[in-house]
């Protein structure tokens, strides 16, 4: 296998999909040497079968806003690979969503899910609809229209969606409710459901908690932990919130959080009370992070990301390609000892090279943020056996999975 040749061929066949090309390039460049030790792989064209999705669904979503106007959006579901289990991956509602982004996410999801050792394939879906600024009624009408097409392509043994950016408990609840209405079935077809109707304890916290459990395993290899360490966190959604919560629980200090408008820097640290305010601001009122700065009198930088601030650990938890090569150089120069990715592909290839050259601890999102899908897999298990585990049971299983993923990375990684 010649990685450059395979990538060029994919670019020719699937042009104008930069995020997908980037994700494939990152994987091919790291496995090329090992792959070529196995000529039997090429005989069955394994690499193309791994890179190209099994199927892609695209559809128009037509819905009515509160003013009675008809709106249209695009809906997608990428079913990438089901070699080891049903397709599994979130649904994203954001104006930036396109086929390239969803193909990259589904590709990454396939590897992430396999690392958990749970029987889950990889998939991803979503729409260019943004819940921001929409009423509950508008979100519900859109979701119901979205599900009128999606429901026929999913199922507990076929494809099990979950939440992602723009899709939280409210949206998953609307989707699951519409799915039940259309199918007349109560099955584990969605994860991230409300606790009252088949959801799992620890699922909302799982991606953030899992990232910190993975980080702790990395820090152990250097004989240290989170106590007294300062942390830069990007984002202020689900992943960032529970990343911050676990950092505080383990004795670390959170200095920053952000949203698409800018970031806050609180030198006194975002403590439990302040984090509760952010959770209420974001989850209940759908507010902006600058309101935190107005309330607590700390620094707010508009239109920027927090990577120029000085800290011990960086935890990118917002979105893809949010941390570039220059940001990485600044972090290294400021003495960062570890970077652990809570988001999917938040670091550009240039940034990753900077971290690797500097020999700091670096955890790629495929491994570090696998906690969310791990607990989704545990939710699927609980649904299938009609049992519900305690928070302590689920958390212990999550810790064990993240520890095993770290051990696999140490054993087989480069």
Regions found by a protein language model. Name each.
Residues 2-23, 218, 317, 332-414:
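Adenosine-phosphate binding glycine-rich loop
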Residues 40-71:
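Structured beta-strand/loop patches that form or line metal/cofactor-binding pockets in enzymes
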Residues 59-124, 128:
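Phosphate-interaction motifs
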Residues 94, 113-227:
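Glycine/serine-rich phosphate-binding loop and adjoining beta1-alpha1 elements at the start
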Residues 104, 158-162, 186-190, 233, ...:
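General beta-strand structural signal in soluble alpha/beta enzymes
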Residues 191-194, 199-310:
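Glycine-rich phosphate/diphosphate-binding loop of Rossmann-like nucleotide-binding domains
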Residues 301-311, 321-338:
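Rossmann-fold NAD(P) dinucleotide-binding segment
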């Amino acid at each position: 296998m010649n990685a450059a040749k395979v990538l060029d061929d994919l670019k020719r066949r699937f042009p104008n999909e930069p995020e997908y090309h980037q994700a494939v390039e990152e994987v091919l460049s790291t496995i090329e040497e090992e792959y070529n030790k196995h000529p039997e792989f090429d005989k069955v064209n394994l690499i193309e079968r791994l890179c190209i999705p099994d199927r892609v669904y695209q559809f128009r979503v037509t819905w009515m806003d509160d003013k009675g106007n008809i709106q249209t959006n695009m809906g997608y579901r990428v079913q990438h690979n089901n070699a080891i289990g049903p397709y599994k991956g979130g649904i994203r509602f954001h104006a930036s969503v396109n086929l390239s982004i969803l193909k990259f996410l589904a590709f990454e999801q396939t590897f992430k899910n396999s690392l958990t050792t749970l029987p889950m394939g990889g998939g991803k879906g979503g729409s260019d609809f943004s819940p921001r600024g929409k009423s509950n009624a508008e979100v519900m009408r859109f979701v119901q229209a979205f599900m009128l097409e999606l429901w026929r392509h999913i199922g507990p043994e076929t494809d099990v969606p979950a939440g992602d950016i723009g899709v939280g408990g409210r949206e998953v609840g609307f989707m699951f409710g519409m799915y039940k209405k259309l199918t007349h079935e109560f099955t584990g077809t969605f994860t991230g459901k409300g606790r009252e109707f088949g959801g799992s304890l620890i699922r909302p916290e799982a991606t953030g908690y899992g990232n910190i459990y993975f980080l702790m395993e990395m820090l152990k290899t250097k004989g240290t932990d989170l106590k007294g360490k300062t942390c830069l966190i990007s984002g202020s959604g689900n992943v960032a919130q529970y990343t911050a919560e676990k950092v505080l629980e383990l004795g670390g200090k959170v200095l920053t959080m952000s949203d698409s408008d800018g970031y806050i820097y609180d030198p006194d640290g975002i403590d439990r009370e302040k984090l509760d305010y952010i959770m209420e601001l974001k989850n209940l009122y759908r507010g902006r992070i600058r309101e935190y700065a107005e309330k607590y009198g700390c620094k707010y930088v508009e239109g920027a990301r927090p990577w120029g601030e000085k800290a011990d650990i960086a935890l990118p938890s917002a979105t893809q390609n949010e941390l570039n090569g220059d940001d990485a150089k600044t972090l290294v120069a400021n003495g960062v000892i570890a970077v652990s990715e809570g988001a999917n592909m938040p670091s550009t290839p240039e940034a990753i090279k900077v971290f690797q050259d500097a020999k700091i601890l670096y955890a790629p999102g495929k491994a570090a943020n696998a906690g969310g899908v791990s607990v989704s897999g545990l939710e699927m298990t609980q649904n299938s056996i009609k049992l519900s585990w305690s928070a302590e049971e689920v958390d212990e299983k999550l810790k064990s999975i993240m520890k095993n993923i770290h051990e696999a990375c140490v054993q087989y990684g480069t």
